């Protein structure tokens, strides 16, 4: 590990590796990522990996579309599988108000170039044969949505970053960050200090701790989410074994 880099990325999850990948793609090859344990050992490893294109914001929607497009070509670029499944996404509406929201979104989707369909209960039943559609008004269907394996994606981004000149060091905990009078930054680790122009924190659950190293109190806290794993469902098992396409994400 060198003692001087242009940029130091702190955190080895999907955000950190993506940032390093894109820095190197932009010509900042003299960049390094530091991870205190192993890649994906934070919140990335147990993320659901869903890729929702739906967003009412034009700017965020563009990022979503870019991400989905990137994930589909990343395996070809790096040779590292990302386990991308383009099985689509169904957003169900039980009220006319919800369908109106989806119609408002259609303008954003059309501007960004995101394929979508506003469909009724009969079409929902065709896409999801096991759905009870009696109380549904309709749905927003994104055929290009799907899901990805977060760990595989992280490894592909890391490989892509290395292919473009980036460096990654695991088991390298950042213990301090300070700024010099000439505006350079010094990042302290158990393996020694690194001087750089820019430090980017991608530490997820540890964002507050990282912020405190530079005198910032970031209003970031971990939030509990539900992740339910069911037992085998005979109808779905028969459907999958019958060679049918993967059902859309609901």
Residues covered by each model-derived region:
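Dinucleotide-binding Rossmann-like beta1-alpha1 core, especially the glycine-rich loop
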Residues: 49-127, 247
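Gly/Ala-rich phosphate-binding loop of Rossmann-like dinucleotide-binding domains
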Residues: 20, 24-25, 160
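Helical element adjacent to the flavin cofactor pocket in flavoenzyme catalytic cores
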Residues: 140-198, 202, 206
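Short loop/edge segments at beta-strand edges and connector loops
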Residues: 35, 120-121, 170-172
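Flavin-dependent oxidoreductases
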Residues: 18, 177-250
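A short, glycine/Asx- and small/polar-enriched loop/turn
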Residues: 97, 128-136, 178-186
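Glycine-rich FAD pyrophosphate-binding loop
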Residues: 24-45
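Beta1/beta-strand and adjacent pyrophosphate-binding region of the FAD-binding site
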Residues: 1-15, 32
